[in-house]
Amino acid sequence: MDSIMEPYVADLLADDITASMVELLPGDGGAAQMDVGVLDAYLRAIGALPAHPAAPGADLAAAAEVESMASNDDTNGVLYDWDTKVDVKVPCALLPPPPGFPPLPVPGLADEPVYAAPARHLPPPPGFPPLPVPGLADEPVYAAPARRLPPPPGFPPLPVPAKAEPVYAAPVDEGDAIRAFMQQLEWSEQYNGDNDAPAPDNSTASRPQLCAPYDDDIDANLRDMEKDAAQRPSPDYLDTVQGGQISAAARASLVAWMGRLTHRYELAAGTLHRAVSYFDRFLSVRALPSYTAHQLSLVAATAVYTAAKYEDQGTVFKLDAREIASYGEFASAQEVLAMEREMMAALGYRLGGPNAETFVEHFTRYSKGKEELRVQRLACHVADRSLESYGCLGYLPSMVAAAAISIARWTLNPPGALPWSSELQELTGYSSQDISSCILTVLNTQ
């Protein structure tokens, strides 16, 4: 080794830089005292000589050295790199195993945690049969009615009750229902004509002072007003005055729109009936300049506006022309006011005529009790729906009200009540035969 190193040592000592470092080496600083092994390691460290080949088992030694330098987090696979001064994540499975130990398996699907598998999927212990695969039989027993469980030993099985179909599930033909109603109405006429028939609970005998003197005057006044031709619309004005430009379906749509307007501003109950009366009476005497949706809506909205003024005592919100113009998307409030002046002139300033809602309240003014009040409310609703029927213009408002009351009684069918009674005939002045055709007209609009 000395013979090999001597030429290199001589060259290095001749170099000025190396000569200045001789004093840093162990010994007296002379070449004779220099440790050749130390110099060899130094030369190989600075790259002057090639590195020694790796000895057998060097990997294990390097791994042991790295493991010895690991930080406190080496149990989590985090090692400390002394060169970069940072922690390096090294999976423990990638480190070489100690001598005499097999290498660790690479993690895969088979190494997933066992908690993800239900216990019944694990193999059974030795000597035990495997658990059955879950299915319908493993559903909780509370989902099955008790009658489906097997009976105890010695007891016969419980009989399964027959499935009862609900009554409302069967569809009812409207024609059959109307025919049944008319038959019951005819039967009530025969029943009321029987002199031996007992008087119902709501008969005139149970109501003292039913026909007081002022009641007769009020009734006579209402009857005269409803027959006044100046306060009634023409039953065929769509053809005779408007020339067929407005259909019955278009009129029904406008009436429904007027109903939404009255509900939007919570107007009084009689506002809609009075507004529809103004609408029909105006179109019965004035042909429109145009039949656009804007023009028809303007007439309908103005009728509601005028009726709301008449029924202002029962109105929550006071309407003005600006509200009507905003709801109907008209040009301005002046357009509504101009139509109002034209409508008032066409109506002859006669705004207080009776309508069907007026007569429903008049005929049921003595109603008392829960069932009779229900009949009264439903009769008012039926009268509201009858406004959409163009055919109802051919009947007096009192007859439409009587038909609505009969339909309400038949629909609710209170105990002991018939579609028509002798008391109702006395109050309204109509027999069941008188209102039969009006009932059919009203039912066709429901």
UniProtKB/Swiss-Prot annotation:
What top-level branch of life does the organism fall under?
Eukaryota
Keywords on this record? Cell cycle, Cell division, Cyclin
Q: Where is this region: Disordered?
A: 191-216
GO biological process terms, semicolon-separated: cell division; G1/S transition of mitotic cell cycle
Q: Name one GO cellular component term.
A: cytoplasm
PANTHER family reported in the protein's UniProt record:
CYCLINS
- This chain belongs to the protein called Cyclin-F2-2
In which organism is this protein found? Oryza sativa subsp. japonica (Rice)
